[in-house]
């Protein structure tokens, strides 16, 4: 599948042509993810929702100076403005410019901006004509504050827009999720149980995966010509060899690079406890521990609710000490990410 244009930038058309309802695209900085998606909806007159994580982000992009449509409008030689529709969202419109330079909206609404953190306030609105939801920067940067039950908020947002169109014989809403490779343990990957799949794709150098049974497509924008060219620019010369460079140019998730991910011969270990989705084992002789998604034997059992996690951690907090001392190993990145989620 061709996912780059002749200039080396990401091209969204073939991704959307898969017709899969959920399309997750992770790639380096500045390879054209957002530009390609927004240009496509304008070129093809597709009604869309442009989703960001927080209301502050939506408020910012609603200003003309920070609009993601400004570079597209400049490229196409048109004007696109944002018009407030409610306290929480705006509509994007084509616009005419007066002799005084004032922009006036004309024609129908092209699409809407919405925030994941406040979309529940808009559940009554009709989105019958929306066929594409673009969730930009769906993986938060590490310094960003998490949204409580973030994945559930996204699923509810999808349901709010999709409604019962499939029961009426219509195609489901397509959700195009775009981001940099900031965090493999992000809420969407975790709740959709995609971490192991993404980890395997990275190990194999696999650019895309299409799962028609689940309706999910995953695209890793590795080996972009744009990323290679950016390596010679000032910022990336200064940050050569850093985690930032690996994320921004090489599309690397740091969670997949730990030395603690090391499949072990399970027969050498004894199960001691199982919590949520993971089991912990103690080596029979060398004092190390192992964490896996496998469950066998008769370990202490704990759920993943708040009270069970507290009870588990109170008894087994020494597992964190072992982790800090590099004596706790993991079957895969999923196991380590879940452990960090439960222990923190």
Predicted segments, located by residue:
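Phosphate/NTP-binding elements of NTP-utilizing enzymes
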Residues: 2-344
């Amino acid at each position: 599948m061709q996912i780059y244009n002749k200039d080396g930038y990401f091209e969204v058309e073939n991704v959307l042509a898969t017709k899969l309802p959920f399309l997750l695209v992770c790639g380096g900085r500045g390879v054209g993810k957002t530009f390609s998606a927004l240009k496509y909806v304008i070129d093809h007159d597709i009604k869309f929702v442009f989703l960001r994580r927080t209301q502050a982000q939506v408020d910012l992009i609603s200003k003309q100076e920070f609009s993601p449509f400004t570079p597209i409008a400049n490229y196409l030689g048109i004007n696109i403005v944002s018009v407030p529709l409610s306290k929480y969202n705006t509509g994007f419109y084509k616009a005419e410019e007066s002799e005084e330079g004032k922009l006036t909206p004309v024609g129908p609404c092209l699409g809407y901006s919405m925030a994941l953190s406040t979309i529940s306030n808009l559940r009554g609105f009709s989105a019958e004509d929306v066929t594409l939801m673009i969730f930009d920067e769906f993986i938060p940067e590490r310094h960003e504050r998490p949204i409580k039950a973030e994945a559930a908020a996204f699923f509810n947002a999808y349901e709010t827009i999709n409604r019962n169109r499939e029961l009426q014989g219509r195609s489901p809403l397509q959700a195009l999720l775009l981001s940099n490779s900031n965090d493999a343990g992000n809420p969407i990957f975790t709740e959709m149980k995609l971490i192991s799949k993404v980890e395997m794709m990275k190990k194999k150098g696999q650019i895309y995966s299409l799962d028609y049974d689940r309706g999910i497509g995953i695209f890793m924008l590795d080996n972009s010509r744009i990323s290679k060219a950016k390596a010679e620019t000032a910022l990336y010369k200064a940050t050569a060899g850093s985690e930032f460079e690996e994320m921004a140019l090489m599309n690397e998730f740091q969670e997949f690079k730990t030395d603690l991910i090391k499949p072990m011969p399970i027969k050498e270990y004894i199960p001691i406890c199982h919590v949520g989705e993971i089991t912990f084992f103690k080596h029979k002789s060398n004092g190390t521990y192992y964490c896996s998604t496998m469950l066998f034997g008769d370990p202490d059992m704990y759920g993943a609710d708040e009270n069970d996690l507290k009870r588990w951690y109170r008894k087994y907090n020494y597992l964190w000490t072992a982790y800090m001392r590099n004596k706790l190993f993991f079957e895969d990145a999923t196991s380590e990410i879940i452990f960090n989620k439960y222990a923190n």
